[in-house]
């Protein structure tokens, strides 16, 4: 079961998801999707039960937004480079560089190549907070990718993104998921922007019940 303190939000559940590919958890606002994401990432403890992995997990979370004002002097490069070095003080083994992981390229080259991969080439020196919503998500995805994550959780990635941005960002996410071994888990209340059939849908009801719909 998941929740906050002694307050249960949803569960109990029992389900499994294969490594790699695009997986989507969908459900109405307030049903526990973000709480599930934080529990999966070990940012908050489960009330009961355990999350079990059959791989060594190295997860990154792409939040809905970073609380930065437009005059905050942090560049796109700075945000993405953090993926190489930062280890949030959560006590979680899912964050930071993999044990023994070393970089065989300069950080500047790694970041530049990843920005090109997500469609932000030439934007290294732009202030992150002045990017559009879709561009910010791309930068945060790049930060997850430079960290060599094998699990990327995107929390409502289309919030604050216009229609044109939704289409291009949706294509980026699905292309990355289908052409890598990374498990992408998208948390959303609206899956209409996803241009392909995901590996599976995890449907969460308003009452906290979950159903699994694998790709046929």
Which role does the model predict for each range below?
Residues 141:
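Hydrophobic anchor residue at the start of the ABC signature
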Residues 148:
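Conserved catalytic motifs of ABC-family nucleotide-binding domains
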Residues 187-189:
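H-loop/switch region of ABC-family ATPase nucleotide-binding domains
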């Amino acid at each position: 079961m998941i929740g906050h303190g002694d307050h249960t939000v949803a569960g109990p559940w029992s389900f499994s998801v294969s490594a790699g590919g695009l997986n989507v958890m969908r459900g109405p606002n307030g049903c526990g999707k973000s709480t599930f994401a934080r529990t999966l990432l070990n940012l908050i403890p489960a009330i009961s039960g355990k999350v079990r992995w059959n791989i060594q997990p190295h997860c990154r979370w792409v939040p809905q937004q970073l609380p930065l004002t437009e005059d905050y002097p942090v560049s796109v490069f700075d945000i993405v480079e953090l993926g190489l070095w930062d280890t949030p003080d959560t006590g979680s083994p899912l964050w930071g560089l993999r044990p023994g992981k070393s970089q065989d390229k300069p950080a500047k080259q790694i970041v530049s190549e990843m920005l090109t991969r997500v469609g932000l080439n030439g934007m290294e020196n732009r202030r992150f907070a002045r990017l559009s919503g879709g561009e910010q998500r791309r930068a945060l995805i790049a930060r997850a990718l430079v960290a060599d994550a094998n699990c990327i959780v995107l929390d409502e990635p289309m919030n604050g993104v216009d229609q044109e941005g939704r289409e291009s960002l949706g294509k980026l996410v699905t292309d990355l998921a289908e052409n890598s071994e990374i498990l992408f888990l998208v948390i959303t209340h609206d899956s209409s922007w996803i241009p392909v059939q995901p590996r599976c849908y995890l449907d969460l009801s308003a009452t906290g019940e979950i159903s699994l719909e694998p790709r046929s």
